Each structure stands twice: as structure tokens, then as C-alpha cells.
Amino acid sequence: MLLGQCQYCGFCERFGCEANAKGSPHITVIPVALRYSNVDLRTYCWVTKVLMDSTGKKATGVAYVNVLTGEEIEQPADLVILAAYGLSNVHLMLLSGIGKPYDPETQTGVIGKNYAYQGGSNVALFFEGVSFNPFIASGGWGTSIDDFHTNWNFDRSKHGYIGGSYISVGGSNGRPITYRPVPPGTPPWGSAWKRATAKWYQSALAIGASGMVMPNRYNTLDLDPTYKNRFGQPLMRMTFDFKDNEQKMNRHSAEVIGQIGRAMNPTIMGNPNPRLTWNVVPYQSTHNTGGAIMGTDPGTSALNKYLQSWDVANLFVMGASAFPHNSGYNPTGPVGALAYWAADAIRERYLRNPRQLV
């Protein structure tokens, strides 16, 4: 597919690209797939569950609702692949009764286990008279260091945690409406806020740390006992907070980025802000992993190494829901690699002889 050229409009992050300059699925993967006569793309469809046979060991298709008409449809299938967002994959498995739901008290079950997020810290820097042109960030520019992440020579023991954080400085957006960095102490509204917004839009920079999150028995996904979606199904409930390991790691990364920030000699510097507790209100990360993890033991994992369900041989589950824990790095690259890995196993091994591949 031929991509367009970036227009440096400032709306790259979190938006579709009107110039078709980003490698988004709707201008790359989907148009290529639609060239094949055996591909049928159905929009405005919400899958509600995986259909099973009487044994509960074989998927027979999926049920979905046309959200425009409300029509409920059952689509038969010999092979089912869950390729929704990771959280949605877990939700569908729970709704469909596939695999045993995880119980944090007894530590039995596998579906909903090992939910993980990302830790980290950040600090804002303001440089009077310097222009960083955030609106031409093209989705992400800058640099990062791995000294406190995957560097085996970094002694973590004296800081009291395992894992680590990579540290980066740069920009990922310049959205003219929502990107409005102002120094600490600026009024949240009024003429002073407007002046600060205009003055510092071009001249603000952030240093951030993105840290690992280790699995914890009490960080889980399950079906909510109270709240339901528009189709009357239980919503998925996320139970999560940063534990002692992440708090120590985030405090340490805040110290490091503070040192880096002061060495850059900004006009104004905010306070380094470690993530010590999870909160849905301020943006922290969007990288969710776990809940339907892969492994070598059906008693402790939901999927085998080919992302095939241990319980239902003709069901494969893509996405970061397969990750047993979360790295400081974003999961996008490995998600794509695992999808290729699983697709190859499906085509070269499963379709030739449908069975458990492990």
C-alpha cells in the first residue's frame, strides 16, 4: 500500500490520519485483506460470545449484534480467532465460559490472571525562547536510554525492586486543543492561564519513564457482579493498583529524571511525578496486558505458545492478553510478532491437521 505524506498537522496522536500517512490498519492491513474474495468485513458488529458445542470443548462460531439494527446473528465457524483488544479478548472468554476464571484468594483458574499495566514517572520542563515545534512530532520523536531498564549491570538491589524503567525525552503530539502545558502555579483558568498557554506551547518538553509491572495475585480481570453493558451482559471488572515493587521503581525513576531535568537547565521545572497509585482520571498509560496468558502448563496459563486455547483447540487468542507480565516497553511490536507466529502455526500446522498443537 502507498502511504501519503505527513502534513504535520498536530493531530497525529490519538486520531486517524486524513493524509493516510500513518500505518493504521484501515489503510494498510484491511485494504490488502479485502483484495481476497474470501474476506468479508462486517462493520458495526459487536461480538457477544463464542458459541460452543455440547461438550464445551469445541467452538462452533460466534454470536454478534448489529448495533445499528439490533439484529442478533450467529456466525458458524470451524475456527475462531479472537483478535479484539486484549481486554476484550479476556471479556469474551469470561462471557463464553472458556477456561476457568481466576480466583485471587485460592490462586486457581487462569482467565483474568496476571493483569498488568505500566508504571513510570514524568517531569515537565519549560525553556524560555526555545521552540520544540510539538505539532510536527508525527506521532513520536525523541530519544531514550535503557540504563535503568534492561541493563544487567544496573544494581537494582540497593533500590529494593526488580525490573526497571526506560527513560525518554521527546514529543508525541502537539494537539492544538488538548496539548496545553503550563508551569506549576499557573491558574487553571482565566487570562493568566491563556497567556501561559500561548507562551509555553512551543517551549515545553517532558522527560518520562515507563516501567515494568510485575504480575500480582490481586491484580485481576473478572466479570462485574453489578454493572452490565447495553446487551445485558456483565461488564468486565479490572482490579488493579501499583504494588510495593512498582512504587519503589517509580520513585527511583522520578529521582533519575529529576537529575536529568536539572542538568538540562530549564527556565522552569516541575516536580518529578512518580505513579504511586492507579487512577482512571489522569492519563497514565494505555498498555494493558495479561488476563489470557500463554505458558507451558494448562493449570497456570490460558494459551499455549501458539496462542491456542488449552481448553478449546479451535480457538486462538491474539493480542497482549497473552503476556504473562508487562515490560516497560510498549507491547505493540511483540503483539504483531506473536500474531505472525500464531498465523503461521494455524496455516502450516493446524489447518492441515486440526488438533492441539502442544
Model-derived features: positions:
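Conserved redox-cofactor binding core of oxidoreductases
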Residues: 1-47, 279-284
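A glycine-rich dinucleotide-binding beta-alpha-beta segment and adjacent secondary-structure elements
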Residues: 8, 48-53, 202-213, 218, ...
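Glycine-rich loop(s) and the adjacent beta-strand/alpha-helix scaffold that form part
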Residues: 23, 36, 45, 49-53, ...
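Non-transmembrane alpha-helical segments in soluble domains
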Residues: 30, 93-94, 254-261, 343, ...
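Active-site-adjacent "gating/activation" loops or surface patches in catalytic cores
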Residues: 38, 43, 55-60, 77, ...
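Short, hydrophobic/aromatic-rich segments at coil-to-beta transitions
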Residues: 57-63, 203-206
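Secondary-structure capping and boundary motifs in well-ordered enzyme cores
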Residues: 73, 84-85, 107, 249, ...
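FAD cofactor-binding and catalytic pocket of flavoenzymes
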Residues: 108-236, 242-247, 285-290, 310, ...
